[in-house]
Amino acid sequence: VELVDSHCHLDDAQFNADRPAIIHRAREAGLKYILCIGTGDGPPDMGAAIRQAEEHVFVYATVGVHPNDAPKITSDTFKDLERLAAHPKVKAIGEIGLDYHWDVPKDAQLPAFIQQLEMAAAMHMPVVIHTRDAWADTLEVLRAHWAPKGLPGIMHCFSGDPAKARECLDMGFYLAFGGVSTFPKASEVREAARVVPGDKLLLETDAPYLAPIPFRGKRNEPAYVAHTARVLAQTRGEDVEQFAAMTTANFARLVGITSYTEGSVKKHVL
């Protein structure tokens, strides 16, 4: 089986004690690609994911300012972001978006989101979108500032209904489903997964967060994406190996990976 984890935080401190074992289990489980999300612990730490990508040939990275870190942005942040995004193993800008769950000022989040969308478009890079308790505003910003660019992106940890899925698909997004889709009460999310065309589906973990059944509540890791793959393949009435291979090919196509060898050597931009 060939699997992809299109969204994890391999650089998270929760993995510091046993990261080599995490990588080994991912390989054993059939992970062909891992996308490590380079938001770090705020803007000064955006490059942490790149270090993981430089260490492991099947790991790739993103860089971006998470909406919860928007107030930490300084005059240097976007210059740093553009420099890091030029690294050959950085494949997208993200995760970026809007998060109204916590008390982070909207007047900091919105301009950070829009500026990163514009930067990604200028660099012809996909985006990884985070939205939490902010669907209406997120979709409005994407309609105005991303859809007209004709570039793809990933809706991370998709948790909407089929109508929201269709709206994201209409704007050219791939939809990434994670551990939440395995939860008993997530029937609406599974219904959305049913309506997504096969060539627009991705798998993710968001590790170390949001572990799928049967590991819910425990530390998540990339190898667990296999459990999500089984649930979603069953939901769609598809063979799990074919489903896994399809989502893995989708990821490679989206981010433009043509071989393992690219960017696997140490780079100097950090």
Q: Language-model segments: which ranges?
A:
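Mid-domain alpha/beta scaffold segments of enzyme catalytic cores
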Residues: V1-L270
